[in-house]
Amino acid sequence: MNIIFLIILFPLIGFLFLSLIQGTISERNTNIIGISSIFVSLIITFFYITGFINYSSQIFTQKLFSWISINELDIDCSLILDGLSLSMLAMILGIGLLIHIFSTWYMKDKEGYSRFFAYTNLFIASMSLLVLADNFLFMYLGWEIVSICSYLLIGFYYKTTNNTSCALKAFVFTRISDVFLIISMFLIYNKYGTFNFQEIKFLSNFLNVEDCFDLNVLTLCLLLGVMGKSAQLPLHTWLSDAMVGPTPVSALIHAATMVTAGVYLIARTHFLFLLTPKILYLISLIGIITIFISSFSALVQQDIKRILAYSTMSQIGYMFLALGVKAWTAAIVHLIVHAIFKALLFLSSGSLILSCNNEKNIFNLSKVSSKCPLLYVSFLVGGASLVSFPLITSGFYSKGNILFSVLKDGYFNLFLIGLFCSFLTSIYTFRMIFVIFHRSSVSFVFSNKRLAHNLPLLILLFFSTMFGYFIIRLPLFYVFPMVKSLENGKFLYEIISSFISFLGIFIAYHIWIKQPFWFFRFLKFKIIKLIHKFLLNGWYFDFFYKILFIHPYLFISKILSYEPFDFFPTFFVAFIKKTNSIVLKSVNGNVKCYISTMFVGINLFFILVLCSFLS
């Protein structure tokens, strides 16, 4: 029985129901529609997972209908379910379901309750379409709807001007990137004569690596096309501003799912990048630079959600680094592990913010560990997984596989930078935890948490530990090329990595808990203040973009806003009016002026006549 299409259909039906009847049903009925639609899709996904337990090489396909048929161009609306799309689906629907359950507590009695669940259901449907589509064109449909959902949810509180500006910024940045994605699709069709992933993969086997200049251009455009959505340098600045939306949105879209769509697309088209090693190296360079920049920016942020946003950029950078060294499986495993612990951190921060009267500054948040131990443990486990705390966290194994793959592939310089940034990650993560939970501050009253609040956190907390990593077994064996695993030296690497994590936590404890006065005294130096301000403003990327792009664009737009053909009649009318005013000044009733004018006129007349005779 082929029912893949139902995975997309149920969330889509949920979106349509909630959109059409919003405001007319209770919050309880909204919950039932919004959650059950995703739950049914997740059950169907588990049905297919059972088919992959013993047959991981199996591929399910389903043709829905013929979309375009013009001469030799035949494009079907078809779905494909292999190990990669199944892994992504389990993550999207599993985490999406938990976030929807949490949102019933978070959004309770808030304006736009049904609208929120309608948007998130549409997002789940479009993200499912993105990973299930078997061709570029059908995938692009889901890709664009995901961007629309992101825009709608960032600007969910649209009555605030700043929120709409941030939503528009995210939309524009991702649109810039999408232009290159469209170009790459045209180049792919020109090269292969098809948009189908499996057909392109088959035809790529007959191409020569040495004779692929057009493939370099193609994969470069494809890389540029995914950088915007995955918030990689230089199209990364929108993500930190996207945190103005509801916190469950940040967990669902801007940490767990949408921002990883670029990683998925590169993994899906890995057979193209294998033919272009230079572009692969460029992917790893972009990843490591993004890791470096975002890690330093996170060190000085005071907004809890912006800290998590910069950490998201950094972790996606690690995924790009893995893709660049052909560690495809390591990238996807870290993608899913990161989605779990980052969703845990975002939901915990959302609970904390809501309980503390929407306070987001970590230095103003209260000492809450004794009042809500679940939040403290959630932050501790999620943060430990983020910093790759040894042995007991899932992040230790997933990120460790990436860095070890970089090392064994011979990129020692990239490995050192990645290891150093892992050290920075442990500092800024535990800076956040120590400041929030271990410093005395103003106390806030916490509301009693319901099952809808606690259950998602407990499930995510469990899967963020080592048990989650060992339970999750992704069916990727037949999706990517088989690579011989070399474990020589891995134990030594794990010791070094563990030491770095402990060192970062130790430094964070001494700077912000044990002896904070030394740190604040250090900040009084002028050069340190300038560096702090530079990093706090995200390396001034937005400032440079305004100077280089926005201001020239506004200047040119202002010039072009005037219709050029309107200039001539306006100028002619102004000339007539000016001439008329000058002539009128001569009619002033002064006889001497009239005689002088006549005298000058007669003399000019005779001079002209004389000149005509002489010529």
Curated annotation (Swiss-Prot):
Reactions catalysed: a quinone + NADH + 5 H(+)(in) = a quinol + NAD(+) + 4 H(+)(out)
Molecular function per GO: NADH dehydrogenase (ubiquinone) activity; quinone binding
Ranges annotated as spanning the membrane: 1-21, 32-52, 79-99, 113-133, 136-156, 168-188, 247-267, 279-299, 327-347, 372-392, 410-430, 457-477, 491-511, 536-556, 594-614
Main location class: membrane
Keywords (A to Z) from UniProt: Cell membrane, Membrane, NAD, Quinone, Translocase, Transmembrane, Transmembrane helix
Subcellular location: Cell membrane
Enzyme class of the recorded protein, top EC level: translocase
Entry EC number(s): 7.1.1.-
InterPro entries assigned: NADHpl_OxRdtase_5_subgr, ND/Mrp_TM, NU5C-like, Proton_antipo_N
Membrane topology of this protein: Multi-pass membrane protein
Subunit structure of this chain's protein: Composed of 13 different subunits. Subunits NuoA, H, J, K, L, M, N constitute the membrane sector of the complex.
Name of the protein in question: NADH-quinone oxidoreductase subunit L
Organism: Buchnera aphidicola subsp. Schizaphis graminum (strain Sg)
Gene this protein is translated from: nuoL
